[in-house]
Amino acid sequence: MRRNSIHKQGLYLGSVPERAAVANGATPLTLDHDLDVLPGAGRRLTVAELAGHVEDLAGRISAAGVKAGEHVVVHKAANFDVWLLATAVARTGAVPVMLSHTLDGPTLAALMERLDKPHLLTDGPKLEALAGLPLAELTRSVISVGGSAPGVVSLAELAGSPGVRPRLQGLDEPAMITHTSGTTGIPKLVVHTPRTMRARLRPQLVLLALMRKRETVAIHIAFGHSRMFAAMALCLTKGMPVLLVNRGAPEDVAEFFLKHRPGLIEALPNSFLAWENLADDPRKPFASVKYFSSTFDAIHPRTVRRLLGASARRAQFFQIYGQSEVGPAVGRPYYRWSAHRMDGRCVGYPLPGSARVRLVSQNGKRPSAQNPGLIDARWDGIAKTYHGEQERYDANVHDGWWRTGDVGYRSKFGCLHMLDREIDMIPGVGSSLEIEDLVLDKLEELVELVVVLGPDSRGVPIVCTHGDEPLDLGRWRTAVAAYPQLADPIQIPLAELPRTATMKTRRVELSRRLEEKLLRQG
């Protein structure tokens, strides 16, 4: 068996573009933005050109002093070159560490301390933003995608460096590090290996095999997210044309999709939520879409119905539930004819070749809607460890099962219902996520609704409206009449909602801000 087979043995990120170029070199990739690291490359590439750019950048990174086995933090502005640089780092045999551009300075410093002097690969604006950090103490070297500066190595000045052949780790050695969302504090550093990353492709390969024709795939995911690397590996391997979306504003997305007409869109739930109103756009930007795919978090039923209705094809909406440490765990499709019956808490059934899932009682009684159990997962796709926090990782492992931190139950038909994060449960409220689904269904003017724990232990609805228009309190009271346990709503501008790099609402942070606001008023 070939050690670098990405399906049967392991997913080796640094060799994916080169291998794909051999089989599908002419397949196009189209971007809605320019690459920071290669501004002259243009917005339309072939897979063969992509592979050449990865080899070129790997040579430059090696010339900058990066060695196999070392950590290289990739922390720069959102751009497809984040994926490109990480893949080039992996080709050198070093370990790319994907730290989101949304992380603040203190958090970034804390994570780099945990990594013990990594290289930092960044850009000019980020270097200016990090001016207050002791980078000389925190890092082995600082490498910039742009111009040079004192103490900074410029990749631009290393153009023409000799290329490097892919250097492959062992199947169970660290190959990439990403981080958790950090909704409860400093993020954890999640270690992925070639074996765990390869395992996560299995269920998705089965789903892709069901597609009758090769579709153009539009991807709008944080470029440093673990899901992005899986999605790109699948698209490149299968020779599927790719549209890479960085500009996520609805009007920008509409224009890009109208021009290039994707057949499959992969995006995060809150991105689809932000695009909902495009369903009513007379230009019909979703008309060509056969498949919508949303991963990791549950998606609101209203969003699914509206997007399916916006397609001119017999569209399907695939919801896949999982997390950074687990990968895809369960999933299910929705269709236009069945979406009106969608229960937003039913996140899916076991996927072929994917994780096993169990429910663990919290009190000795059978898990149910009224008595949710702890959701555990088990398979070979679970991340290897938390870098620098093995004890914290081990605390989540119970008899070989990974404790996800979510609570839920199984229906009589076997569908896993995810009701809440354990840490976000509010006494006397039931499922906050279920309330959010049902109220969003009734109030189309809401673009986001988050129920968080208030200072008096009541559930406080935080609402955001389209265009930040004032909330109609009469319509609100009618919509929440079945939930007398809720406090009065607090409306904030959507831009003030604290989010992670993957657009998750940071509920703990939102609750903290709410408490501070009420204390100031009180």
Predicted regions and their residues:
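AMP-binding/adenylate-forming catalytic core of the ANL superfamily
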Residues: 265, 379, 384-385, 405-485, ...
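N-lobe entry segment of adenylate-forming
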Residues: 1-64, 473-477, 511-522
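Gly/Ser/Thr-rich phosphate-binding loop
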Residues: 263-266, 278-342
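Conserved pre-ATP/AMP-binding loop-to-beta segment of ANL
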Residues: 10, 25-29, 160-179, 185-186, ...
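Conserved AMP-binding/adenylation subdomain of ANL enzymes
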Residues: 198-216, 224-264, 278
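Conserved ATP/PPi-binding loop(s) of AMP-dependent carboxylate-activating enzymes
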Residues: 349-354, 363-395, 415, 430
